[in-house]
């Protein structure tokens, strides 16, 4: 109905994904951005490549909007997915008031003191290892993001994974969906 159309028009969310290079940070951001494209929204995905990439901290910024994105660069995200302590320290204070932070509590011991945001502590790295999908903590956190924000439809994820993952590695599609499901159930 018209109400739904109106609600959709108001969607304009920004997300920062951050962690060590090698934790699949850029992939997670690309996946969410791709889902936005499948849903015919405006999206931007800006990876930060820099001296910190190898072994250091990698991050990317994603916008998903129903209106044209005037500037894909932002400082204060609505949502934050963080997978290491340096990222936690760098970004936790930048989340918008009323925003949400998704924290890999297997990797980050800090607890958020802010009362104006919602923090979700997900032992994503431990859960991935326990479920035989080591290296997919990033997607477990994406599942939790979807569950708590509804930013994209779960159905879009399978289509996006099939586009992003090369055919030679298509077994990874099912493993990613398993990781997503674990995150959605937490």
Task: List the predicted regions and their residue ranges.
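Short, small-residue-biased leader/transition segments that mark boundaries at the very start
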Residues: 1-6
């Amino acid at each position: 109905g018209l109400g739904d159309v109106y609600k959709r028009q108001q969607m304009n969310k920004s997300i920062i994904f951050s962690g060590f290079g090698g934790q699949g940070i850029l992939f997670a951001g690309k996946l969410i951005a791709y889902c936005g494209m499948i849903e015919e929204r405006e999206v931007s995905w800006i990876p930060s490549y820099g001296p910190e990439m190898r072994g250091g901290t990698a991050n990317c910024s994603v916008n998903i909007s129903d209106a044209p994105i005037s500037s894909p660069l932002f400082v204060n995200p609505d949502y934050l997915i963080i997978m290491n302590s340096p990222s936690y320290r760098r970004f936790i204070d930048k989340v918008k008031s009323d925003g949400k932070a998704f924290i890999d509590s297997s990797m980050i011991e800090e607890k958020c003191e802010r009362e104006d945001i919602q923090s979700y502590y997900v032992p994503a790295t431990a859960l991935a290892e326990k479920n035989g999908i080591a290296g997919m903590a990033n997607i477990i956190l994406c599942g939790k993001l979807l569950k708590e924000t509804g930013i994209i439809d779960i159905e879009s994820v399978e289509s996006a994974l099939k586009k992003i993952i090369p055919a030679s590695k298509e077994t990874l599609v099912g493993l990613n969906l398993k990781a997503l499901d674990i995150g959605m159930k937490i």
